[in-house]
Structure formats: structure tokens, C-alpha cells
């Protein structure tokens, strides 16, 4: 008969399960927050979509707001800031177009604006994790102003394409709009090199 040694643990498997569970919850939350918003999404719905017990949402994230904040943290602009300034417009617009059916962080943020706590979390996140790093990367002159203008440009486009779809943003017109958005994005970036 084999008696297990207490030093032999199964923690790595449990840890992998915990990581997988946490990731499933975050994926489900991103999907629901970006299609329904914060106020219209329940913890039970997130858990059901993730295939887990709803108590695990509280265990991993503390609250629905904690889950929302963690979902925001999944959004990371820093990989986009590793590239060349001269091709940033093409690269960044490609990010928007490469997965058009995926749940989007912008939709999640906009649809969650009605809730005061989610609104505050979104504004804080946007400034700290998007505008400030983008401004620092753009550098002088007026990196913060240029970062804000890029955010305005991208937000306006994504709202018109995803949330309040303009019918003429399809087919060849969408391709032309993509080229325009790339050029406008690059023009704002290039203001610092003129």
C-alpha cells in the first residue's frame, strides 16, 4: 500500500484550475458588460456564462464592481506602444478591425456609464491606463492633448461603427473609412515630429 508523502501536493493543478476559472469569469464578464453594460449585468449571469458557481465571482473579485475593474485591467495599450511611431496609425486601426465580432472594451465602458461607480472606475482607468501612457509615448509637444484627440477620434469611430451603426460603414465604404482613420490617427501622432 502506498502512503503519500505530505510534501507531494496537487496545488499546481488547483492553481491552474483557479487561473482557468478566473479567466473564464473575466471573459464572460467582458462579453456581458460589452453587450449589456454594468447595470444590466448580474453576477449570476456572468457565473452562468463562465460555467462556474456565482460565489466564485465574489471569491476572486470581491464584488461586481471589483469584477468590472478587473475586466478593465485586461485592456492593455502598452503592446501598441512598443512599435514605430511612423506606422502607429496603421497598426492601431488594425487592432480595431482585426476582430470586429469580438466583445469590445469601448462598448463595455460606454454601456456602463449609467452606473456612477462603473463610470468613475472607467474614467480613472481611461486616464491612468490609456491617456497617460499614450501621452508619455507620444511625447512633446502636447502629448497629453494628442492622446486625448486620438481617444476622441477612435471613440467617435467605434461608436458610429459598433454602438450606433451607420449603415454606410460597410463594404467598400468601410475600407475607405479604415484608410481615412489610419491617416487621421497617423496625422495626430505626427504632430509631434513636425
Question: Locations of the language-model features?
Answer:
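Amphipathic alpha-helical segments used for helix-helix packing
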Residues: 97-132
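Short alpha-helical scaffolding segments that buttress acidic/His motifs in well-ordered protein cores
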Residues: 92, 106-113, 150-158
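Alpha-helical DNA-contacting segments of helix-turn-helix folds
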Residues: 59, 70-75
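Short hydrophobic/aromatic patch on the recognition helix
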Residues: 50-61
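Membrane-embedded alpha-helical bundles of multi-pass transporters/translocases
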Residues: 3, 43, 59, 89-90
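Hydrophobic/aromatic-rich alpha-helical bundle segments in the mid-to-C-terminal region
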Residues: 119-124, 136-194
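Hydrophobic alpha-helical connector segments
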Residues: 77-110
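Basic, helix-initiating cap at the start of DNA-binding domains
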Residues: 1-36, 40-51, 65-66, 76
Amino acid at each position: 500500500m502506498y502512503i503519500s508523502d505530505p510534501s507531494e501536493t496537487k496545488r499546481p493543478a488547483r492553481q491552474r484550475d483557479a487561473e482557468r476559472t478566473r479567466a473564464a469569469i473575466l471573459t464572460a464578464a467582458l462579453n456581458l458588460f460589452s453587450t449589456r453594460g454594468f447595470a444590466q449585468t448580474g453576477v449570476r449571469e456572468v457565473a452562468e456564462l463562465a460555467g462556474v458557481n456565482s460565489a466564485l465571482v465574489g471569491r476572486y473579485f470581491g464584488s461586481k464592481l471589483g469584477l468590472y475593474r478587473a475586466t478593465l485591467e485586461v485592456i492593455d495599450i502598452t503592446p501598441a506602444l512598443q512599435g514605430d511611431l511612423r506606422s502607429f496609425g496603421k497598426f492601431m486601426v488594425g487592432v480595431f478591425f482585426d476582430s470586429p465580432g469580438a466583445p469590445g472594451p469601448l462598448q463595455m465602458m460606454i454601456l456602463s456609464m449609467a452606473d456612477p461607480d462603473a463610470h468613475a472606475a472607467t474614467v480613472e482607468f481611461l486616464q491612468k491606463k490609456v491617456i497617460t501612457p499614450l501621452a508619455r509615448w507620444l511625447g512633446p509637444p502636447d502629448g497629453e492633448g494628442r492622446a486625448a484627440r486620438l481617444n476622441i477620434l477612435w471613440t467617435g469611430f467605434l461608436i458610429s461603427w459598433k454602438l450606433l451603426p451607420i449603415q454606410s460603414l460597410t463594404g467598400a465604404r468601410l475600407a475607405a473609412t479604415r484608410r481615412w482613420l489610419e491617416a487621421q490617427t497617423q496625422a495626430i501622432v505626427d504632430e509631434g515630429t513636425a
